Amino acid sequence: MTMISDLSKDLVEEILSKAPITSLGAVRSTHKQWNALSKGRLLYKAEAKDQFLGFMVMDHRFLSMIFHLNGILKGDGEGFDRPSIREVGDIVNQIDISKVFQCDGLVLCVPSDNSSVVVWNPYLGQTKWIEAREPHDESDMFALGYDKDKNHKILRLYDECYYYYEVYNFKTESWGEEDHLPGWDIDSYNRGVSLNGNTYFLTQEQRAKDKYRVFLLCFNFTTEKFENFIAMPFKYHRKYVGTLSCVGNEKLAALYQRWDTGEMAIWVTTKIESNEVLWSNLFKVDMKPLVRFGFQQCKDEAGSFFIDEEKKLAVVFNLDKKRGKRNNKTRCYHTAYIIGEKGYLKKEVLGEAVEVRKDVYRSALVCSSSYVPSLEKINQIEEEEEDKCKSIKMVDTKRQRKKRKRKSKR
């Protein structure tokens, strides 16, 4: 009979790679070797090249997603597997989620009731509810990051006129003093992107001579200040769309599309320093065959996307509206647009979108980088209980040893 301990390391890694993201924590209790491998499991070689593993919010449902990239660029479509999307059976799926952010293996969810936020560690299965000082508005922006000591924090940015902001500190379990960002505009639909603890936004200078100029703005979670306004390699206009993503934990990526021409460009950073950011154009493509009027840019949303730099492709999530021929009724579908260099275009429908209110729909929001498991404990009560259990076990073990010694002497 084959035992778990008889399985090779390669086979165990293959089994773990097939396990859902949210089941990794349960795997740890199966066997000591599996526990060690799952702890060290970032992304296996096959996954890093062939799959995107992450989270998304679609119609207020919190979902895990595996997007298969292997065979995606074949012209005949053979070898392409549809993305695997499933609901997460956890406390975060017992509520309506409006926004989702990811940083360092932790996921920040903003419920639709606007009274609190919840941070979740999918690997450990821990959640931490954080009450807001006051109910937040639908247009408020959030970000998750950490300081130089790896202490995690949450940024809340609100009031589109004056851009006030406050920071929640996990260590002190409290919100800090209110501050504001003078002279700059950050569109609420453009979510920030977390990279190496800091969060980056696209912004424009208020009352500037060149009103179409776009800047990259960094929020530093160590200083808890906005800094480094660095010009982007493109300009904004009513007919232009721009949004950010990232490439692993090393680079930023920017999507830029002109609605008038249908041209889309993907840019990737080659250098990120405090006073200088350099960009390289990954590829350009004409989107008119797939999207007639360009990606939609609505309140609380812009086309979220992720890229595979090696394959030179991007997967953009947005809405695709179709008008019925018989009843003239518009139906809206969640759609993944797979875009690559040399004009590669493919459209994958994920399902029909739910109407938020009359003729209003919300695009799916996707975390921009593959999920990397974290051992960061975010629930202090659970952590204290676990430490107590360990202490009790140690005491019991010592008592048992003493009893055995007494018996041996007799």
Curated annotation (Swiss-Prot):
It holds the Pfam family FBA_1. Residues 399-410 have a biased composition (Basic residues). Disulfide bonds: none annotated. Residues 2-49 form the F-box domain. Residues 387-398 have a biased composition (Basic and acidic residues). PANTHER family: BNACNNG10540D PROTEIN, F-BOX PROTEIN CPR30-LIKE. This is F-box protein At3g19890.
